[in-house]
Curated annotation (Swiss-Prot):
EC number: 7.1.1.-
Annotated protein name in UniProt: NADH-quinone oxidoreductase subunit A
Known function: NDH-1 shuttles electrons from NADH, via FMN and iron-sulfur (Fe-S) centers, to quinones in the respiratory chain. The immediate electron acceptor for the enzyme in this species is believed to be ubiquinone. Couples the redox reaction to proton translocation (for every two electrons transferred, four hydrogen ions are translocated across the cytoplasmic membrane), and thus conserves the redox energy in a proton gradient.
GO cellular component labels: NADH dehydrogenase complex; plasma membrane
The UniProt record lists the keyword Cell membrane: yes
Chemical reaction(s) catalysed: a quinone + NADH + 5 H(+)(in) = a quinol + NAD(+) + 4 H(+)(out)
Family in the record: Belongs to the complex I subunit 3 family.
Pfam families assigned to the protein according to its UniProt record, in alphabetical order: Oxidored_q4
Sorted UniProt keywords: Cell inner membrane, Cell membrane, Membrane, NAD, Quinone, Translocase, Transmembrane, Transmembrane helix, Transport, Ubiquinone
Predominant location category: membrane
Length: 148
């Protein structure tokens, strides 16, 4: 087996090398061009939002509940799970029973995580103070309360 020299490697991959040089050059050109051609004005009116000729009133920031971020994180976690399971399902013939057992363990670990999230109340949308407590109808009925 013959070792390839660096000139043979370059000769084989010259088109990709030129592509990389041009791509990096264009990125640098756009960054430098934006810096040179961009505006330099720093005034009070430049930093205020403007829409349809109407000055803004109040703050443009919206405060979102942290629950929306939790839902987004859960979506990403379970979306990545689906991605791994899709990759596993396309190669199920090559992985055989070992791959099946590994996928089952993966699903069980994720289900255990989901059960944990449900048990700590991470998926509850109602505030803690407005949650209803479970009432045993035999011992804590309205008629039993009057008798005590």
């Amino acid at each position: 087996m013959r070792m390839s020299t660096s000139t043979e490697v370059i000769a084989h991959h010259w088109a990709f090398a030129i592509f990389l040089i041009i791509a990096i050059g264009l990125c640098c050109l756009m960054l430098v061009g934006g810096w040179y051609l961009g505006g330099r004005a720093r005034a009070r009116s430049k930093n205020t939002p403007f829409e349809s000729g109407i000055d803004s009133v109040g703050s443009a920031r919206l405060r979102l509940s942290a629950k929306f971020y939790l839902v987004a994180m859960f979506f990403v976690i379970f979306d990545v799970e689906a991605l791994y399971l899709y990759a596993w399902s396309t190669s199920i013939r090559e992985s055989g029973w070992v791959g099946f057992v590994e996928a089952a363990i993966f699903i069980l670990v994720l289900l255990a995580g989901l059960v944990y999230l449900v048990r700590i109340g991470a998926l509850d949308w109602t505030p803690a103070r407005s949650r209803r407590t479970l009432v045993n109808p035999e011992t804590d009925s309205p008629t039993n309360r009057h008798m005590q």
